[in-house]
Curated annotation (Swiss-Prot):
HAMAP family assigned to the protein according to its UniProt record, in alphabetical order: Ribosomal_bL20
Record lineage: Bacteria, Pseudomonadati, Pseudomonadota, Alphaproteobacteria, Rickettsiales
Name the UniProt record assigns to this protein: Large ribosomal subunit protein bL20
GO molecular function, one term: rRNA binding
Native organism: Rickettsia africae (strain ESF-5)
One cellular-component annotation, GO: ribonucleoprotein complex
Length: 117
């Protein structure tokens, strides 16, 4: 019985890793041993940062809302508390978008919130 080598399989596996490593510096884009380490680390970073992105955007929205609310004499925490009292259910993403792009709509929300402080 002849020996079955995994030539095609390993070549395809190497090709897949080297394709993912395209654009890396030095031997990381051409040497399989180095490339596999770099690709694995890059995938770990990607996994971690997909979760961190949600955290970062929430912080950005809060900063934008806080800056816009301070122009009207309120603080972020007071504003959010007042929104809860008035039962206005708008999430932070939409509030930040209103604060940046639709200041008239945001001002009307702030005025409604001010009435309940």
């Amino acid at each position: 019985m002849t020996r079955a080598k995994s030539g095609k399989i390993s070549k395809n596996r190497h090709k897949k890793i080297l394709k993912l490593a395209k654009g890396y510096r030095g031997r990381a884009n051409s040497c399989f041993r180095v490339a596999i380490e770099k690709v694995e680390k890059a995938l770990q970073y990607a996994y971690r940062d997909r979760r961190n992105r949600k955290r970062d955007f929430r912080g950005l929205w809060i900063q934008r809302i806080n800056a816009a609310v301070r122009e009207h004499g309120l603080v972020y925490s007071q504003f959010m508390g007042a929104l809860k009292k008035t039962e206005i259910d708008i999430d932070r993403k939409v509030l930040a978008e209103l604060a940046v792009n639709n200041s008239d709509g945001f001002v009307s929300i702030v005025e409604k919130a001010k009435a309940h402080i």
